[in-house]
Amino acid sequence: MRKLSPIILALALSPLVQAEPVSEVSPVGKIDGMVSLPVTGMKAVESNGRIVFMSDSGRFVIDGTLYDAWSKKPLTSLEEIREAGNTLDLSRLGLKMDDLNPLTLGEGKKKVVVFVDPRCPHCHELLKQALPLTKEYTFQILPVPVLGPDSERQVRQLGCARDKKAATDALLNGRIGNLEQDDACNLEPMQRTLVTAQILGIQGVPFIVANDGRISRGRPNDLSAWLEGR
């Protein structure tokens, strides 16, 4: 998936691997701490009691205030920046889940948003872990085509299914091709889901947003424990 825009709270990037040369070629002195920014190619670096923002190469350094437009506050410490990159309050984005027409698994009071690709093995493992938790949680499943043309076809079949419960069952058991399709299918929810994934910077699945806003980029080893914050 391609990113729609470099927005704060998108997917964090891989860690910087050459910290020593970076300190040599930049105006930053001793590096006391570093956090990956959810912005392409940038890190937040703490040095001598102040925070600056540095390109991955170390060539460019920006001195200023980082403001999170989604949560409407400045981020003034590495801990705040780290938390901003690892949590997500979808309500602050004005996002209505009904507009995305998610597949639903469970009937619990706690809502969990899950982006999956129907052809993703780790996504299926995640959904298996979700099945015993459906009394406590409601999993709102948003299929996105990460793995190519076959995924695009299956996502469309899920989105255009006449029966949403049948679509959820088909996703779980891998029989998407047997779904009865709605000839007058509305493609808007699928398009909105894709745009939402791009805005959030989702580059891989599964991507999970817990009921308390914590993010998991990938499948937790123990879904139940992760949802409980353990």
Language-model-detected regions and their locations in the chain:
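Positively charged n-region of N-terminal signal peptides that target proteins for export
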Residues: 1-4
